[in-house]
Amino acid sequence: MNACRRNITPWRLRSRTLELGRRTLIMGVVNITPDSFSDGGRFLDPEAAVAHALELLDEGADLLDLGAESTRPGSRAGGAAGSEYARAVHPTDEDLSLPPQEAKTTSWGPRLLGTPAVSSEEEQARLLPVLEGILRARPEAIASVDTYKTATARAALAAGAEIVNDVSGFQWDPGIAAVCAEFKAGVVLMHTRGRPGEWRAQPQLPPDELLATVRAGLTASLAAAAQAGIPPESIVLDPGYGFGKRLAENYALLARQAELLSLGRPLLAGLSRKSFLGHTLAPLFGGNDAPIEAREPASLAALAAAILHGTSIVRVHAVRPAVETALIADAVLAAARGGPM
């Protein structure tokens, strides 16, 4: 495997510009939800969430990503039981092999196809006090808001957020791109293969077709951004690991991730504690998926692979181990290009 050569690229945010590619930037996750798969509502209280965010910054996070609606396994969004949602978002190969009419139904999919599971008002009520508290304590902090809703994006940007991280890549709420353009925000556009309620009906794709599908989806997101007046230098792309991809597809995508750099924008990868990592570790856990708390070493291995395949930003839950891993991977990249470590 040849290490990828990242380009040094500016990323223009709402009030500042970051340099991407010289070293890997660490985006620390702050979940402000009662049902996050990773931390189970530990930081729903605003004071606890702010304290956690400040700890992540002290551990070396370059950016913070604040989310107030869970889009991960174990969520109870829209009234769905956690196991129902987990199967909708990260279905097993058995689930995915069933014809659509035989697949198990969930309450999450239809809601996401229609109205959001968490209203924008509730999302803002969770999010804004934490965002404001972080910026009071650390005015220099760079905050991203993880949302696909126009109203939430507007409120967060007005409150000082620099970045909108949209898991739908501007595909689920048509107004959000215009808001990002209005505020001159940085944006992260992620690829999601359809919507969660549709994923079980989708066939497994061979690597070439999978990469073409991800490329086409990200190209559509770039077109939506351009139509809204968002300049390319404000955009980072995310391949969307775990979002509408089976276990084998995630690894195929990771192995060929660097080919997405041909789209002309830097890459962000969110691999931390993902369920496909837990499934891969199942032989070590009696045939069961590795529990969340046991996935950190696998997360770091995936993080290193992503960096060596062209990622400029990694989105993580445990910041200090990610900082250390990124330093080693960046040293490999520097050696590959013949530059200083």
What is the predicted role of each segment?
Residues 1-31, 226, 230, 333-341:
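N-terminal amphipathic alpha-helix/helix-capping segment at the start of soluble metabolic enzymes
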Residues 51-67:
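Catalytic domains of carbohydrate-active enzymes, especially glycoside hydrolases
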Residues 34:
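Catalytic-pocket segment enriched in acidic/His residues
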Residues 9, 45-46, 65:
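Glycine/alanine-rich phosphate-binding loops at beta-alpha junctions
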Residues 13, 38-55, 71-85, 112-137, ...:
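Active-site-adjacent loop and "lid" segments of alpha/beta metabolic enzymes
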Residues 89-90, 94-104, 110-116:
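Short, low-complexity intrinsically disordered segments enriched in A/P/G/S/L with frequent Arg
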